[in-house]
Curated annotation (Swiss-Prot):
Protein name: Mitochondrial inner membrane magnesium transporter MRS2
Quaternary context: Homopentamer. Forms homooligomers. Interacts with MFM1.
GO cellular component terms given for this protein: mitochondrial inner membrane
Family according to the record: Belongs to the CorA metal ion transporter (MIT) (TC 1.A.35) family.
Organism: Candida albicans (strain SC5314 / ATCC MYA-2876) (Yeast)
Gene name per UniProt: MRS2
Keyword Mitochondrion: yes
Amino acid sequence: MYHIHRLLAPIRSNSVFFSLAQLPKPSLIGCRYKSNNVGSQDSKRTSKNSILHNLGSYSNSAESEILNKLKPITPNDLYVSCTSFDRIGNITAVSRKYPKMQFLKENHLFPRDLRKIDTSSIDVVPVIMIRPSSAILVNLLHIKAIIKKDNVMVFDTSKSEVATKLGIFMYDLELKLKSPANNVCYEFRALESILVSVTSYLEAEIKLHRQQCGIILAELEDEVDRAKLQELLIRSKKLSSFHQRAILIRDVLEELLENDEDLAGMYLTDLKRFEPEEENYEEIESILESYYNQCDEYVQQAGSLLSDIKATEEIVNIILDANRNSLMLFELKITVYTLGFTVATLVPAFYGMNLKNYIEETNWGFGLVLVVSLLQGLAITWLNFRKLHKVQKLTMMGTSNSSKAGTGLSRHIPPTSRVDRWKRGSFLYRLFYGSGGKYSKPSKKFDRPTNREKDAMWRMINDDKAMK
């Protein structure tokens, strides 16, 4: 019954005020209930039963109707467009255009203040500006508003994707202002409604990022795919943008909490003078601290997710580098084998020339050419694999085993079995991996430093630490 009286209240009083929840389906805002429409013969004959029948479906779709009615406007250099709410939450003006100079004079603002909150297609850094005993200027995400002690003006947007969010905010703002005050100032209720809308969208966005990025990271753990990496890059850019916006909003709230003069200026209904000795701003501090902690939580979650993405990217890069090196090594091995076989076929090619060489008359010519060709091919293959194996080694100082032995790194290598030692000493192992191994004799000998050299090195180390 309460909803019926609430719906019929503007009709009975023919008031100029209206509510977002009371709007009919043809329009959300912009039209008042005029007496000629209310007093028509068809509307008078409407029964209470039909109202009750349609009220349930209307209440469920009230918010969806708001989403489809607000439309973006075109920025104008001469006018500002905004929607106004009075002290009890009723809408007094809908998308009303004010001349900028007149608007500045009526609200006691400067032109530089209007640049922060004016409707524009350019995103401005989030800000909450305080005009003591006059107004609070708010620009947070999709909301640009001016809060006074008995009035709230919400600026219209020029972006179609923001119009939906702004419609939901106006609906929530109206309900918040119409609810019981509970000894909370009007300006604080309006500001809290803005902060609730901002933190709600931050929470929804960080949940979406965590869900989408979490799925991609889990898939990359199983398989490194090009499409997944590209999608992760796109998500990472969006997450970085969200992280930056959340940091800016958190910094705005932190600056307000640290400035007692601004806290005192936010009391518009009950004016307070700034007195450094008396810091009694518990009401506004509790509101700002609550939403500051929420913003800080979203910043930490976004930063943690960015760290996970960065760690995953580094691991993927290491895997890709290892695969790339393996492919290059495989290609080099094929090249070495090809070179060995090519050199092995060189002598038979000479032997097969249609010229007299007096070898074909002997019984051992074929065997000699075959043995020489094989030895030549194996020798070339062995030399190339030996050089390739030296290139593969990564040591602290140089590529030789002697430097590794000199640094003492080989002491930490676990001992191998006799079978492994025999394999490393075999002809095939030396052929394909070179003669340089753990158990081979060092090709160079390094003398131990003398005591004088040790003292000089110690002084150099200490001097370097002092300089750092």
